[in-house]
């Protein structure tokens, strides 16, 4: 786990509410609600979910959908649907958010991001900026300064005045808040019949919760009109015509046995009559994968980031290393496409624990289980592995980076 995600966990984690219950009349209904329309080969909501599921600082995700959209959501989200909680939203965006916040109550997150499903071009950096700006009793709003000249219309349909754009910003999502205060604000607005707020920063303002502005992104557009869907599809289709920058990294690690009662492999403790010797928990599989991930963006190796001479890593869980490497990859624009680990040992048996290992890696990397492969083989009694003196691991990671392969 990264340092940032460790801090978030200590305060209850960073949850996400994604609002996807709207009917999208302005974008047209010919192809269904806009969050389920196809752009670049997938539904809009699938692009949105991918970003948040992959982000190392986000935790539980709740999606508020329309009562009629169960099958649409299942088809659009695919394997992602198993990793989020879908609830029935309300008749308005405001009520859908309130219901989403209530669905998180038993999990008591420390912070929450609220995002429109129809903003599929949100990026990891914007999410990071928003989370980092959330205070103990202070929200965070990504926004862009208004660039267009603004006119106020009169009742007669003519220009009444030119509005100064000084200090004006266009609000975006995700909007971030400490969980308790924003839930209380939504509940109070509901009880008082104040159902006219158009975003959550407005509710926070009404409830006297300070909201800090953070730089938004020009790419983080909301798909509102039919032409927006067409432009988004064109944008993604155009990006896919380039030869993608797919990079592959390899990692290798080995640890010797010493007296103990279990080994930790790929994040799972396995009972054994020995343990692996190392400065951390000696998870040979995760160490190899950490090197493989870092190799995809030329970011050194595990020893560069977590030197064994540093006492703070003594006995540390190796998931910290993997999640850090995944964050480094994402900060450099990468998207993890696949992770493959081969464990080389005579014992213990890996097969009975493969499913748990895959699930653990899925959580660490923020990718679906079908993009993870964990294999095991013996060394046919040859060498130190064959003599059961230790375990070796080989890992390969594939990462897609933006842009094209340079000539």
UniProtKB/Swiss-Prot annotation:
What PROSITE patterns does the record point to? ISPD, ISPF
Question: Which Pfam families does the record associate with it?
Answer: IspD, YgbB
Gene3D superfamilies membership: 2-C-methyl-D-erythritol 2,4-cyclodiphosphate synthase, Spore Coat Polysaccharide Biosynthesis Protein SpsA, Chain A
Quick one: which pathway?
Answer: Isoprenoid biosynthesis; isopentenyl diphosphate biosynthesis via DXP pathway; isopentenyl diphosphate from 1-deoxy-D-xylulose 5-phosphate: step 2/6; Isoprenoid biosynthesis; isopentenyl diphosphate biosynthesis via DXP pathway; isopentenyl diphosphate from 1-deoxy-D-xylulose 5-phosphate: step 4/6
Q: InterPro entries attached here?
A: IspD, IspD/F, IspD/TarI, ISPD_synthase_CS, MECDP_synthase, MECDP_synthase_CS, MECDP_synthase_sf, Nucleotide-diphossugar_trans
> In this chain's numbering, which residues are marked as the site (Positions MEP for the nucleophilic attack)?
165, 222
Matching HAMAP family: IspD, IspDF, IspF
User: What is the protein name stated in its UniProt record?
Assistant: Bifunctional enzyme IspD/IspF
Native organism = Mesorhizobium japonicum (strain LMG 29417 / CECT 9101 / MAFF 303099)
Per the UniProt record, the lineage of the source organism begins with: Bacteria, Pseudomonadati, Pseudomonadota, Alphaproteobacteria, Hyphomicrobiales
